[in-house]
Amino acid sequence: MVNRTPGMGGEYQGPEHRRVQPTGPHVRSIIIVRHGRTAYNEQHRLQGQVDIPLDEVGEWQVRQTARTLRDLYVDGRPDIPKQLVVCSDLGRAVQTAHAFADPLGLDVHPDARVRERSFGAWEGLRLEELERDFTEDYQSWRHFAGGELKHGAEPKGAVGERGVEAIDGWSHRAGPDTTLFVFSHGAWISQTLQTLLGMAQGNHDFGAMTSMFNAHWARLTGADQPDGTVRWRMTEYNHGPAIADTDQWEAPTLH
């Protein structure tokens, strides 16, 4: 297994959102998975909310990840017999979710709140183009100072808020006999986790967590609090199947 630890994100915009945490029964654990590779990933283009499908390598990656997730958290956890599957409504995340869910006969629930951060006018551009044509704003973005906001990007705080709203809602639709699987995107995962875990309060630039690799995941477990809410704690981050730690991950032999 590959289990890499946190370090990258973005700036906070606007007043701190006061989250009203739900109470009552909740899922035992949450596994948040990034989609597999796309042509835009391979070309170093900024995807955002452009609806790009997985490429051939990405389809292979998600099959490896789906198999590992089923081995570890379905077959390997008979004490948690049920699974609830949610995904972004963008195709690359939907494909990744179905690679996991279809062999189990599970429904997949798309949710627009789980879609990737919008990068406005920068979407579809190569990183080298951004660096060349928007040098100052590009460097500001890379150093978590918000240069991308001048070009219509969604504020990171807003991404984190809608992400946590989705997590709060779905995690309370089932009980401790269930694992919630959420299939999403790199920026959404970073900004949602930092908001959910309280990291954004001390790091308003959202720079405390690395970006997740394609077809990798994070795992959260819940601790019940005296007031009836749940505190989510991250036990794994940037975890992938064993083959992800080899050169084959980006260049498998497919034919």
Show the residue positions of the predicted features.
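Generic structural signal for well-ordered alpha-helical scaffold segments
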Residues: 63-74, 160, 164-172
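Active-site metal-binding loops of divalent metal-dependent hydrolases
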Residues: 36, 186, 238
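Acidic, low-complexity terminal tails and accessory targeting/binding regions
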Residues: 2-28, 65, 117-129, 176, ...
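Phosphate-handling substructures
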Residues: 101-165, 238, 249-255
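Generic beta-sheet signal
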Residues: 30, 83, 178-187
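Alpha-helix termini
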Residues: 70-80, 172-175, 224-228
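Short beta-strand scaffold positions
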Residues: 87-88, 161, 183-184
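Active-site-proximal alpha-helix that buttresses catalytic centers in soluble enzyme cores
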Residues: 2-15, 22-25, 33-106
